[in-house]
Amino acid sequence: MEKREKLYEGKAKIIYATDEPDKVIAYYKDSATAFDAIKKATIEGKGVLNNKIASFFFQLLNEKGIPTHFIKQISDREMLIYKVDIIPVEVVVRNIAAGSIVKRLGIPEKKEFDPPLVEFYLKNDELHDPIICEQHIYAMDLAKPEEVQKMKELALKVNDVLREFMREQGIILVDFKLEFGRKDGQIILADEISPDTCRFWDAKTGEKLDKDRFRFDLGDLIEGYTKILEKIQKKEGE
């Protein structure tokens, strides 16, 4: 597999072409951003941790029959993935109230949602990723109704798998953000699953082990992410 030119650079990753047109390489950067990149920093080692954590989660989901863009981890910072046409909609699944929903709706933090909530956000930095409904998605021709239903179905399946897996490691999956893409006419999971995109709380102590550590200066980010990686690697080694 030959790594070729840079195709795209985002806040957390760089995408490179390969000598196979349907495959690309995702390189995980050490950048940390919050609040629409108003707060940003370079944190050495963050990219390595996120690549390893995301690779583990994608492999787990692939094994559970959930289609993802992940092929394999190829280095500490890189994974080989399928090239997809990204749908510009972020799908958020919430098991427990935290973050923006608390501020937006006045819902008490830590309120449990049963069943989990599924929300859609327009993937647009200039507009600050506003929350949207299904009708907005159709009106803007972002996705077809059957695609939106598939995204919801897959998001809830991801929640079932990861919530139970993390519970077994003593970690609460509070909420998470997913992105999806089209490949050969099918909807598959894309982007990443990591402490950048999920909220993880220690079930015993309530300690936050995700990007909220950086957002709100709650503690060392690397320490929190390392705890997540150690938990899942310990399980993998059993």
Curated annotation (Swiss-Prot):
Listed GO biological process terms: 'de novo' IMP biosynthetic process; cobalamin biosynthetic process
InterPro entries: SAICAR_synt/ADE2_N, SAICAR_synt_PurC, SAICAR_synth, SAICAR_synthetase, SAICAR_synthetase_CS
First-level EC class: ligase
PROSITE patterns, sorted: SAICAR_SYNTHETASE_1, SAICAR_SYNTHETASE_2
EC numbers, comma separated: 6.3.2.6
Entry keywords, A to Z: ATP-binding, Ligase, Nucleotide-binding, Purine biosynthesis
Catalyzed reactions per annotation: 5-amino-1-(5-phospho-D-ribosyl)imidazole-4-carboxylate + L-aspartate + ATP = (2S)-2-[5-amino-1-(5-phospho-beta-D-ribosyl)imidazole-4-carboxamido]succinate + ADP + phosphate + 2 H(+)
Protein's name according to its UniProt entry: Phosphoribosylaminoimidazole-succinocarboxamide synthase
Species annotation: Persephonella marina (strain DSM 14350 / EX-H1)
